[in-house]
Amino acid sequence: MTEKINLLNLSEPELQGFIASQGQPLYRATQLLQWIHQRGVTDFSLMTDLSKPFRQQLSEASFVRVPELALERVSADGTHKWLFRLADNNKIETVFIPDRKRGTLCVSSQVGCALNCSFCATGKEGFNRNLTLAEIIGQVWLAARLLKSPYKITNVVMMGMGEPLLNYEAVVAAMHLMMHDHAYGLSKYRVTLSTSGVIPAMRRLREESPVSLAVSLHAPNDALRNVLIPLNKKYSLDQLIPLCRDYYSRGSKRCVTFEYVMIEGMNDRLIDAKRLIRLLADVPCKINLIPFNSFQGTAYRCSTESAISVFQKCLMDAGFNTRVRRTRGDDIAGACGQLAGQFHDRTGRHQRWVQKQGHDFNRPIPAIDH
């Protein structure tokens, strides 16, 4: 007996292939996209513009399954955080951040993260596995149905648990559905992928997906970035910055956004701002300064308001479009850097994955004078 297929786990071309295998015309794929993503219907018997024989055929060959809601918390500032349970009992977190007329959904791409960035809570939990397409787009599907008026998803950022470009195929397929007119219909300007700088995948993304790009920079030189983002030892700034400079075509109004977490005494001094100005001198970009969010076990502290203000002014005086991304949802552990998955890596998957990459991102790093 042929195993049933989760239609939520199919990209548009794969869905068309499935429809063809059922002897149906391709426009049925469009109808299914609309029923599943726009109307949120998962019961084939309710898809009334499909013939009864085809609905029966679908129920025998396929199903639609999204992650389960395990926990919901709502912050005083309107931020929503959901803990979703996957079929294998792993859990991921998704956050919705309302802001005036904008509603941004922060989506996870992996269970945990292997990069072990020293300022991020998620990395401390280790890496378990990549999410499937169904588990990524399922977060959007669920959030759209869980949110109550007046909240609405206008933007999606791939900034949740995990490094999106280390789960390339599933992430790009999910973003395509986010932008698809018959699914979620978001503009390419409203879907953003954030990466720590996986250079080969960034080059591929530039050619294959029109989404907006954000880069987790967080340091003005390699010495400090090696401490904050160990991936930098593999893909250093002399590779990353030229790619960011040329990521969008000349004359384009689009530019890369750099994210820079503000950590007291680590990367928030005036000399750090001046080094950052030199580093990005010829790079069309925007800069988001992110106050560090503390988590259990970290020795880092957030920069003071005055230090952040001085840092921002220095960058703006040099001509950089710079804003401070204010902390949201910190009363429910939903702010950036606090997306620690509630699981324990008992299987050794994390170390096996790291070894497969040929680089030990978790090797202890000696103290340096940056």
Curated annotation (Swiss-Prot):
GO terms for biological process: rRNA base methylation; tRNA methylation. Disulfide bonds join 106-336. GO terms for molecular function: 4 iron, 4 sulfur cluster binding; metal ion binding; rRNA (adenine(2503)-C2-)-methyltransferase activity; rRNA binding; tRNA (adenine(37)-C2)-methyltransferase activity; tRNA binding. Its EC number is 2.1.1.192. It comes from the Bacteria. [4Fe-4S] cluster binds at residues 113, 117, 120. Its cofactor is [4Fe-4S] cluster. The keyword rRNA processing applies. One of its GO terms (cellular component) is cytoplasm. It is found in: Cytoplasm. Residues 99-331 form the Radical SAM core domain. Keywords: 4Fe-4S, Cytoplasm, Disulfide bond, Iron, Iron-sulfur, Metal-binding, Methyltransferase, rRNA processing, S-adenosyl-L-methionine, Transferase, tRNA processing. It holds the Pfam family RlmN_N. Coiled coil: none annotated. SUPFAM superfamilies: Radical SAM enzymes. S-adenosyl-L-methionine binds at residues 162-163, 194, 216-218, 293. Binds 1 [4Fe-4S] cluster. The cluster is coordinated with 3 cysteines and an exchangeable S-adenosyl-L-methionine. Its main location: cytoplasm. It catalyses: adenosine(2503) in 23S rRNA + 2 reduced [2Fe-2S]-[ferredoxin] + 2 S-adenosyl-L-methionine = 2-methyladenosine(2503) in 23S rRNA + 5'-deoxyadenosine + L-methionine + 2 oxidized [2Fe-2S]-[ferredoxin] + S-adenosyl-L-homocysteine; adenosine(37) in tRNA + 2 reduced [2Fe-2S]-[ferredoxin] + 2 S-adenosyl-L-methionine = 2-methyladenosine(37) in tRNA + 5'-deoxyadenosine + L-methionine + 2 oxidized [2Fe-2S]-[ferredoxin] + S-adenosyl-L-homocysteine. The keyword 4Fe-4S applies. InterPro entries: Aldolase_TIM, Methyltransferase_A, RlmN_N, RNA_MTrfase_RlmN, rRNA_lsu_MTrfase_RlmN/Cfr, rSAM. The active site is at residues 93, 336. Specifically methylates position 2 of adenine 2503 in 23S rRNA and position 2 of adenine 37 in tRNAs. m2A2503 modification seems to play a crucial role in the proofreading step occurring at the peptidyl transferase center and thus would serve to optimize ribosomal fidelity. Reaction proceeds by a ping-pong mechanism involving intermediate methylation of a conserved cysteine residue. This is Dual-specificity RNA methyltransferase RlmN.
